[in-house]
Amino acid sequence: MKNESWFVYILLCKDSTFYTGVTNDIKKRILAHENGKGAKYTKGRGPFKLLYKRAFETQSLALKEEIRIK
């Protein structure tokens, strides 16, 4: 079984808004946001500052935390 962490993260956008997301590759996902290939919400709102990240053992647990935060 592959040992893979899932992350909930919060980005601060340049317009002082926040974006919360879930990923299993935090560096790759933030790079996607920076390059305009992340979520529709973050397109044109970079650069971003990573304010928070927390690892979870499963995607399900990470998604539950994302919902709780939002």
Task: Give short role names for the model-derived ranges.
Residues 1-39, 48-53, 61-70:
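GIY-YIG nuclease catalytic motif and its immediate N-terminal context
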Residues 41-43:
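Short, glycine- and small/hydrophobic-rich beta-strand elements in well-ordered beta-sheets
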